[in-house]
């Protein structure tokens, strides 16, 4: 699975960047993942592939469990989807699914860290590998 994580803005906190890099490294055994930070919605839309299954992440999306996200990723893979895009944005965009990490506001760096961790957790669940709750 090819996964691209898009967001408008910059991750400034070094600790959050290190955590994202660590999850990126761990995810390498399961998928190809890339974080793409852009300046605005127009740049994001130019970079977004029209063949990707788009999951918008915002505070107004549906709350999912880790198991629910794992099932979503697994189902997409089994049904032939090879490209996924997570877009962290409150902007109005077209999407295939709309999820929330939390109903609370958080910094971009925190949201990206949590999203990468949840994708990693999802793959551990899919492969029946231990992961603490």
Residue ranges and their predicted role:
Residues 16-20, 66-70, 112:
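Conserved strand-to-helix beginnings and helix N-cap segments that scaffold or border functional pockets
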Residues 11-13, 61-64, 92-93:
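Short acidic, S/G/P-rich loop/turn micro-motifs used as interaction or catalytic elements
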Residues 5, 55, 115:
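Conserved RecA-like P-loop NTPase ATPase core
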Residues 28-84:
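S-adenosyl-L-methionine/SAH cofactor-binding core of RNA-modifying enzymes
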Residues 6-8, 57, 87:
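Short hydrophobic segments within beta-strands
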Residues 91-133:
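Structured adenosyl-cofactor binding patch, chiefly the S-adenosyl-L-methionine
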Residues 1-25:
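N-terminal beta1-alpha1 ligand-phosphate binding loop
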Residues 68-106:
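Catalytic beta-strand/loop module used to bind and position nucleotide/cofactor moieties
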């Amino acid at each position: 699975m090819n996964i691209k994580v898009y967001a408008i803005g910059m991750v400034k906190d070094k600790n959050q960047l290190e955590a994202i890099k660590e999850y990126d490294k761990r995810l390498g055994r399961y998928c190809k993942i890339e974080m793409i930070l852009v300046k605005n919605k127009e740049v994001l839309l130019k970079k977004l592939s029209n063949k990707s299954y788009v999951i918008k992440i915002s505070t107004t999306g549906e709350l999912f469990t880790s198991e629910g996200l794992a099932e979503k990723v697994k189902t997409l893979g089994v049904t032939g989807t090879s490209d996924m895009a997570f877009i962290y944005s409150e902007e109005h965009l077209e999407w295939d699914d709309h999820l929330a990490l939390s109903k609370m506001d958080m910094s971009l760096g925190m949201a990206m860290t949590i999203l990468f961790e949840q994708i990693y957790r999802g793959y551990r669940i899919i492969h029946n590998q231990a992961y603490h709750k």
